[in-house]
């Protein structure tokens, strides 16, 4: 469906600074490491907040290994007859691991830090003490295992120590950009609750990712736009899974962002931080100009007078309430941003705005006993905005009097999680997690005047009437949200892990429910437009040419736009999985998993309109081969299928009865408020308002909303790679990744073809009673139910050939290579390069080139003619990605860090009217894959420019303050390069070129400097 919502321009914003801490270095034997990683079998659930410890010890009768954390967790397991042991499902933290023989500790390893989702090797030999040496080779526990031969996926884990060293923005998405294959998404797509910019994983759309917080799914239940994340200082570790993840994960065919929060220990710690980005240290993007049509060369939007400043204040405290038993951690963060933003010349206001983004996080850990742990988590994030609109004169560059108040928003999300872990035996672990998420979405416009109609497209007002100066009014609201809108979700997980010899079997259930309450929008506007005077505005539904009405002789016309959606809907998702981690021998590890997902979406009446509950088997298979048996070279591979659920918001336009109409007129005048006068209605198929998608407000029968043969969207993925230890200091590797989208779910609106097929079958139907659009599997044959006037339903099979549509496809190919030097107490760095290609005829659930956020209800697949020439480079294609980041401890008191991203530009699209004659056969205007009458596939219009983002930071921690006090400065985008990331894609036609075509919509973030002071005790 053509996008109905207008969005204001924003600036893509990734990149902030951090503080520095020095990890303690513990030396372990590399040979011992290799043995244990080759022989140890350990499984950690991908979305869990746990890790494991495994290794080798000299076999002795009654020998055990004891692991004790800084938060009092103690586990003791028996060493097997082969000398192997595994301590699984351990809460993250720092551990002391001891070898016990005859009831006495004979050897100990201290300061062992776990990584989420990973195994940490700790091996023992006959020697005692904190260091074991075999030959002349020793290794550091903090930098190794450099090669994890127990993993088969594409995983990046960023720890709190790294976050304290690297110049990064304070968001989950900015951290995720460190991972290979993860790139910024379309700048206009932001998280509905937090407002942060979103990311794309390996060619997938930004709505196909999953977010987790302490094991709980916090993905936006309404549309999949982002998820809830922690205060930056409360993040212990962030796990980024970009491919190959196990059966415990689902509902994602993009990537996974999983955050684990900090917890209290047996020592009290507290700290605070203040960061400040002043206006004088922030650059501005270049001004945006028209580059086409009648306004070519004129300014569109001025950025040079925009100013903003930001402050972030945060604090934390954590420690024992009862030593070794009960622990507490809490963190708060307050971010405030103020400034001004000039609107476009068509809406020339200077908006003085304020943002406020408070967050908090608490965690309580109760070690009931050595075998049972209870964890309670609470978290909250809020985002509020308010602004005043002042008149602005683009000619004089002066700001005038207050015009009106901008729409203010207050969004919030609160999360509550309880997790129980029971170590039933040394080999059996049960985990139960239950969490709730409550969200509110409030907006209002102070002084809103409903008597004023929003004016859209004022640049297309007839200059013979206006004299070339746009006429608008004080109305700034196109669509108004329901102020009572709220949502809830809950997630129940049960996971059981059982070690049976060389096999570790993990199985569980993953149930997620969400409820979208009082969601909806209403809007109306006058939309001015310009076209060929003698060409019908639309062929289907028919709207006559402009020159058939008074005042339309030169091609100028206007439409009265009405839009309304309103609903309360819910979604039920269920899943079951099982996975076997099989240590075949000392070099081969095989992981075999199977997941089954079921998805059901309900309309406002509680009737299921999408019921995909038949088995949706998602196999996951992978292996790891320790080639030499010493962990110096790993070859691994993975293959899997991933299903994607439909979020709640799909029901608003598909199943709840939406109104989306335009009534067309010519006009002979425009009043002082921008309203057209002297209106002459243009002839239309309905005699009045028309809807290209038959959205006239009727509520569809739930059984007819979707194809009866519909299946979920799913993707197949394949990984093949290797990682090699070059020497004691460097690791390099390569990885190939292939993704194939096998099935998509979107709406098809070609009801004429469905009606014709039904009539050809002899069915007696009234075409005007059909739904506006049907949820379908485009590119495949679909079966539709049509209401039988006598009762019951007709069943109509329609093929993709009937619709004139191509086969649906999205393919991604990526080749990655990297070189890494782990932190050795002095410096660390990683260089990562990805060469990739993403192409096909469907980006996914949303469409970036036109900024359309209607999930699975985009322009794509509505009609066969809008899919002609649609196969090309997709919007998230980045041919080249080079990422370099690292830190250097220049002196005991000084740390320098850098983060560099060199990214090739995304493809550009040119969309125009249909065919060589530039007609409009299905009423979609300039949304066909033709440009000036010539076929134009995605990417045929070229690419956006490269982005070269160089960010540096420095921190000073003086010895006189015992290094507890830190002063830091960070410069984001040192080169101050601000380039186009998105341009306007609608060409219009050769006789009436759209003057907006190819003008810049969004720029990359210009340079800014951030200063900080922090204290950690």
Spans of model-derived segments:
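Transmembrane beta-barrel wall of Gram-negative outer-membrane proteins
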Residues: 269, 303-387, 408-431, 619
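Periplasmic N-terminal accessory/gating domains of Gram-negative outer-membrane beta-barrel systems
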Residues: 103-127, 135-263, 297-301, 310, ...
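Solvent-exposed loop/turn elements at secondary-structure boundaries
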Residues: 469, 604, 611-618, 622-803, ...
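Periplasm-facing N-terminal accessory domains of Gram-negative outer-membrane beta-barrel systems
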Residues: 45-142
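Gram-negative outer-membrane beta-barrel transporters
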Residues: 585, 589, 599, 729, ...
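Repeated loop/turn-to-beta-strand initiation elements of outer-membrane beta-barrel proteins
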Residues: 325-328, 371-374, 427-430, 502-505, ...
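C-terminal beta-signal and adjacent terminal beta-strands/loops
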Residues: 729, 743, 749, 837-839, ...
């Amino acid at each position: 469906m053509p996008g109905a919502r207008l969005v204001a321009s924003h600036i893509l914003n990734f990149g902030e600074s951090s503080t520095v801490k020095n990890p303690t270095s513990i030396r372990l034997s590399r040979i011992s490491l290799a043995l244990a990683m080759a022989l140890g079998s350990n499984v950690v659930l991908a979305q869990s907040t746990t890790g494991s410890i495994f290794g080798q010890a000299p076999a002795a009768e009654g020998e055990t290994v004891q692991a004790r954390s800084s938060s009092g967790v103690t586990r003791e397991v028996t060493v097997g007859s082969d000398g192997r042991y595994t301590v699984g499902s351990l809460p993250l933290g720092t551990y002391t691991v001891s070898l016990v023989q005859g009831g006495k500790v004979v050897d100990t390893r201290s300061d062992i830090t776990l990584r989420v989702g990973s195994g940490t090797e700790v091996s023992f030999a006959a020697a005692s003490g904190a260091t074991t040496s075999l030959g002349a080779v020793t290794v550091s526990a903090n930098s190794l295992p450099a090669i994890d031969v127990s993993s088969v996926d594409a995983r990046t884990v960023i720890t709190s120590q790294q976050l304290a060293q690297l110049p990064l923005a304070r968001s989950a998405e900015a951290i995720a950009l460190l991972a290979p294959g993860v790139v910024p998404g379309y700048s206009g797509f932001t998280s509905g609750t937090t407002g942060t910019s979103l990311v794309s994983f390996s060619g997938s759309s930004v709505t196909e990712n999953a977010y987790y917080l302490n094991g709980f799914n916090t993905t936006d239940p309404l549309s999949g736009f982002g998820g809830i994340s922690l205060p930056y200082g409360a993040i212990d570790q962030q796990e980024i899974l970009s491919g190959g993840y196990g059966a415990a994960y689902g509902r994602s065919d993009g990537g996974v962002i999983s955050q684990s929060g900090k917890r209290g220990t047996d020592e009290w710690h507290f700290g605070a931080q203040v960061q400040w980005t002043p206006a004088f240290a922030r650059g501005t993007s270049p001004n945006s100009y028209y580059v086409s049509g009648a306004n070519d060369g004129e300014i569109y939007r001025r950025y040079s007078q925009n100013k903003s400043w930001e402050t972030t204040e945060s604090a934390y405290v954590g420690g024992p309430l009862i030593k070794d038993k009960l622990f507490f951690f809490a963190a708060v963060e307050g971010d405030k941003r103020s400034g001004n933003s000039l609107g476009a010349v068509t809406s020339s206001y200077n908006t003085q705005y304020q943002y406020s983004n408070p967050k908090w996080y608490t965690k309580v850990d109760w070690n009931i006993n050595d075998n049972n742990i209870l964890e309670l988590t609470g978290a909250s994030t809020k985002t509020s905005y308010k602004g005043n609109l002042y008149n602005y004169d683009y000619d004089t560059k002066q700001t005038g009097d207050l015009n009106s108040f901008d729409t203010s928003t207050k969004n919030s999300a609160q999360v509550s999680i309880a997790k129980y872990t029971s170590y039933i035996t040394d080999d059996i672990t049960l985990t139960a997690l239950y969490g709730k998420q409550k969200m509110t979405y409030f907006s209002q416009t102070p002084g809103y005047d409903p008597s004023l109609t929003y004016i859209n497209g004022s640049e297309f007002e007839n200059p013979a009437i206006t004299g070339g100066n746009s006429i608008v009014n004080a109305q700034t609201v196109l669509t108004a949200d329901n102020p009572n809108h709220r949502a809830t979700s809950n997630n129940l997980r049960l996971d059981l892990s059982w070690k049976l010899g060389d096999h570790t079997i993990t199985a569980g259930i993953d149930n997620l429910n969400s409820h979208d309450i009082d969601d909806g929008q209403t809007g109306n506007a006058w939309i001015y437009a310009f076209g060929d005077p003698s060409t019908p505005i639309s062929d289907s539904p028919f709207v006559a040419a402009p020159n058939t009405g008074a005042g339309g002789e030169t091609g100028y016309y206007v439409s009265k736009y009405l839009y309304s959606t309103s609903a309360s809907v819910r979604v039920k998702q269920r899943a079951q999985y099982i996975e076997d981690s099989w240590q075949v021998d000392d070099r081969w590890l095989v992981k075999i998993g199977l997941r089954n997902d079921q998805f059901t979406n309900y309309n406002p009446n509680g009737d299921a309109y999408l019921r995909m509950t038949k088995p949706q088997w998602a196999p996951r298979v992978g292996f790891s081969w320790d080639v030499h048996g010493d962990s110096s070279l790993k070859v691994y591979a993975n293959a899997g299928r991933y299903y994607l659920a439909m979020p709640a918001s799909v029901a608003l336009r598909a199943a709840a009865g939406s109104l989306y109409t335009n009534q067309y007129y010519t006009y002979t005048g425009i009043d002082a408020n921008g309203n057209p006068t002297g209106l002459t209605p243009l002839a239309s198929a309905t005699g009045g308002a028309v809807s290209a998608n038959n959205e006239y407000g009727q509520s569809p029968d739930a059984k007819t909303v979707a194809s009866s043969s519909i299946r979920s969207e799913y993707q197949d993925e394949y990984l093949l790679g290797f990682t090699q230890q070059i020497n004691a200091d460097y690791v390099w590797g390569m990885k190939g990744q292939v993704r194939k989208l096998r099935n998509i779910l979107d709406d098809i609106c070609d009801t004429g073809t469905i009606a014709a097929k039904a009539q050809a079958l002899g069915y007696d139907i009234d075409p005007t009673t059909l739904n506006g659009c049907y949820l379908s599997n485009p590119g495949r044959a679909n079966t539709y139910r049509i209401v039988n006037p006598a009762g019951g339903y007709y069943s109509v099979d329609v093929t993709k050939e009937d619709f004139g549509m191509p086969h649906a496809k999205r393919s991604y190919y990526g080749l990655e290579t990297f070189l890494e030097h782990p932190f050795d107490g002095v410096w660390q760095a990683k260089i990562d390069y990805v060469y990739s290609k993403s192409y096909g005829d469907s980006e996914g659930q949303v469409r970036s080139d036109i900024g359309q956020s209607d999930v699975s209800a985009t322009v794509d697949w509505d009609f066969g003619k809008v899919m002609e020439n649609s196969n090309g480079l997709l919007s998230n294609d980045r041919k080249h990605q080079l990422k370099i980041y690292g830190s250097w401890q220049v002196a005991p008191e000084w740390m320098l860090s850098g983060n560099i991203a060199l990214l090739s530009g995304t493809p550009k699209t040119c969309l125009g009217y249909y065919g060589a004659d530039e007609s409009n056969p299905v009423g979609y205007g300039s949304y066909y894959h033709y440009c000036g009458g010539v076929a134009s596939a995605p990417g045929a219009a070229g690419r956006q420019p490269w982005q070269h983002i160089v960010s540096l930071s420095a921190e000073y921690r003086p010895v006189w303050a015992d290094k507890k006090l830190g002063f830091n400065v960070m410069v984001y985008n040192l080169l101050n390069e601000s380039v186009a990331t998105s341009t306007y894609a609608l060409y219009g036609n050769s006789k009436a070129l759209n003057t907006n075509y190819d003008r810049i919509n969004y720029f990359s973030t210009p340079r800014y400097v951030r200063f900080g002071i922090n204290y950690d005790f």
